[in-house]
Every structure is written in structure tokens, then in C-alpha cells.
Amino acid sequence: MTNNTINYAKLNRVRLRDGMRENASTTFREFFASIHGKVSGLKGYTILENSDDNNETLVLTFWGSKADMDNYYSNGNSSLSSLVEEVKPMFEKMPERITYNVVSLDVTK
């Protein structure tokens, strides 16, 4: 495993209240900009807005190690807890989180 290897992804499936998608996506982008380079093992993220369902957004985070990912998503992460509290009023329900092993990832620059 090299320093740039992405081995894990965390899917956060977010169900939003009507009209909240733009605000939520902006908040997520600002949050990731604020933690850029400060989170051990975080290799990147992507925000996906469902083109057929305005109330669904997916946030994927990419990780080198499961330990770093698990630490980030632990209850003790105050920055993540603060983000959740900020966007909670926008949620239709709390996000579903699923961990995936990354088998293959190819992004052409």
C-alpha cells in the first residue's frame, strides 16, 4: 500500500428536505475545503447529486486505511459532529453510511 493508494470508500447517502440540495452541497464543499490536508488518510471526496431525485445526494470519501476512515467517522470527531449538526435541519432523515473496499479506481486527468 503506497501513500496515494485508495483502499476504502465511505458512502454517505443523504436524503434531504425539499429545496435543500443546493444549500447542503455548498455546506459540504465548504466543509471539505476547510479540512483539506488536515485529516489523516483522507485521499479525497466527491459529491454526487441524483439527477432524477432532487432530495438525494451522495457524498463519497476516499481513504488509504480503514483505521483512518473509522477514526474520522467515530463519535469523537468534533468537526464531523459539527457539520452534521449544521446540516441536520436539511435532512429528511439521517444519512445512511456504508463502507466499501475499493477494488479499482481510474480517474483520467
Model-derived regions: residue spans:
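Glycine-rich beta-strand-turn "strand-cap" elements at beta-sheet edges
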Residues: 1-6, 46-55, 83-109
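Short, flexible segments with low predicted structural confidence
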Residues: 7-8, 24, 40-41
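Short acidic/polar alpha-helix capping motifs at helix-coil junctions
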Residues: 8-12, 21-22, 33
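Short, well-ordered beta-strand segments in beta-rich or mixed alpha/beta enzyme
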Residues: 8-15, 45-75
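Short, surface-exposed ligand-recognition loops at beta-strand->loop->(often short) alpha-helix junctions
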Residues: 15-28
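Non-catalytic surface loops within mature trypsin-like serine protease
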Residues: 16-18, 65, 101-104
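An amphipathic, aromatic/His-enriched active-site/gating alpha helix that lines ligand/cofactor pockets
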Residues: 30, 34-42, 62-98
